[in-house]
Every structure is written in structure tokens, then in C-alpha cells.
């Protein structure tokens, strides 16, 4: 039996109608973990602290938009937990399953009729005087920008410890193949 964490975006799933529908469909077919904040729903699931939701999960199902996946991508990558996205947003590049197709897609998933698409991620480190100030992983992009009203900022970009370029600018955007699609569309270009 698959162990599945379910994370809804409650601003897109009003009243958690689709989350309830998903849980009811999964009941008896999978072990389900969901944030204890939703215990008032009285669903037949394992309620756990939000910070522990991925501790027992083999898979994550997200109900929301691409932003909901992006919030969890780094943690899931670190734990090697595949993410299945159910689109409640507008475009849904990463949340590829439309809500009307949810039961069919989940049935295939439960029968192991799926492939896992691996996506490149970046590790970013923000350094000042060669000391790491901040470090994180990104699935979409890394954006460095100056504070409003400040002058241009000096940046040095390196990959795997090798200097690539130096920039003096008001910002820099570095996108993965996943993130570049959004920038292409914003500029009136095609889906990449």
C-alpha cells in the first residue's frame, strides 16, 4: 500500500472539496498523511504536524497550482519523494492533472502505471565576503535583486566553484529548464 502525503492549497480548493474527494477516493487504497490543521474535516487519514507530513510519505500529491509544488520541491527532492500535481490553478505546467481527470489519473498511479519525470534543480548560495549568508535549492529560478532605492549591485556568478561572469546590475535571474518556460511566456514567447 502506497504511503501518500496530501497537501492542498486551501486558497484554491475552497472548502477543501477536492481534497475530500481525493481522500475519499484513496481511502482503503493507500495510507494517507495530511496536516493536522485539517483534522476538523474528520477524514479517515493520518493527521500529522505540518512539519512532519513528508516523514512517512513515499509520494506527495499536491492540489493547487505550480506555486504549491514549488513550495515543497526542494524538500521532496532532498528526500527523493516524487510529486504528483493536481491542477487547481490556471496554467499548470507542473500540476499536469486536471481536476476532472483526477480519479482516472490516481487509479493509474495506484496501479503503478506512471513514469517519474526528473527535473533539474539548482543550489544557490548567497555569499558576502566569501561567507555563505543563505543557501537553498530551486526548481524554477533564482532571482537576485537590489533593494528599492539602492544603487546597482555587484554580483559574481560561479558554477561548481568556477567563476562564470561578473555583473553590475539591478538584478539577475537564473532559470532552470522548468523555470525558463514561465519567462518565455511572460515575454510573449512559446512554451519551452
Descriptions of predicted regions:
Residues 62-66, 73-76:
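N-terminal glycine-rich "phosphate-gripper" loop used for MgATP/nucleotide binding
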Residues 6, 62, 70, 174:
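Redox-cofactor binding/interface segments in oxidoreductases and associated redox assembly factors
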Residues 15, 67-72, 181-185:
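Short glycine/serine/threonine-rich phosphate/pyrophosphate-binding segments
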Residues 1-59, 100-115, 126-136:
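ATP/NTP phosphate-donor binding region
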Residues 91-170:
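Catalytic core of DAGKc-family lipid kinases
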Residues 40, 89-94, 190-192:
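Short gly/pro/ser/thr-enriched loop/turn and capping motifs at secondary-structure boundaries
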Residues 162-192:
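Gly/Ser/Thr-rich active-site loops/lids in small-molecule metabolic enzymes
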Residues 31, 80-82:
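Proline-centered loop/turn at the N-terminus of a beta-strand
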Amino acid at each position: 500500500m502506497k504511503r501518500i502525503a496530501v497537501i492542498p492549497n486551501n486558497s484554491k480548493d475552497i472548502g477543501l472539496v477536492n481534497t475530500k474527494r481525493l481522500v475519499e477516493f484513496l481511502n482503503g487504497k493507500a495510507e494517507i498523511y495530511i496536516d493536522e490543521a485539517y483534522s476538523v474535516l474528520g477524514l479517515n487519514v493520518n493527521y500529522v504536524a505540518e512539519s512532519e507530513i513528508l516523514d512517512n510519505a513515499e509520494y506527495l500529491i499536491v492540489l493547487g497550482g505550480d506555486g504549491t509544488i514549488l513550495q515543497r520541491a526542494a524538500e521532496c527532492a532532498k528526500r527523493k519523494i516524487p510529486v504528483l500535481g493536481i491542477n487547481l490553478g490556471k496554467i499548470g505546467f507542473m500540476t499536469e492533472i486536471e481536476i476532472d481527470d483526477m480519479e482516472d489519473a490516481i487509479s493509474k498511479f495506484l496501479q503503478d502505471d506512471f513514469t517519474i519525470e526528473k527535473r533539474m534543480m539548482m543550489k544557490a548560495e548567497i555569499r558576502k565576503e566569501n561567507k555563505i549568508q543563505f543557501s537553498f535549492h530551486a526548481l524554477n529560478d533564482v532571482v537576485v535583486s537590489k533593494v528599492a532605492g539602492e544603487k546597482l549591485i555587484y554580483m559574481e556568478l560561479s558554477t561548481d566553484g568556477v567563476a562564470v561572469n561578473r555583473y553590475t546590475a539591478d538584478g539577475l535571474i537564473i532559470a532552470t529548464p522548468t523555470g525558463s518556460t514561465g519567462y518565455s511566456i511572460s515575454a510573449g514567447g512559446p512554451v519551452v
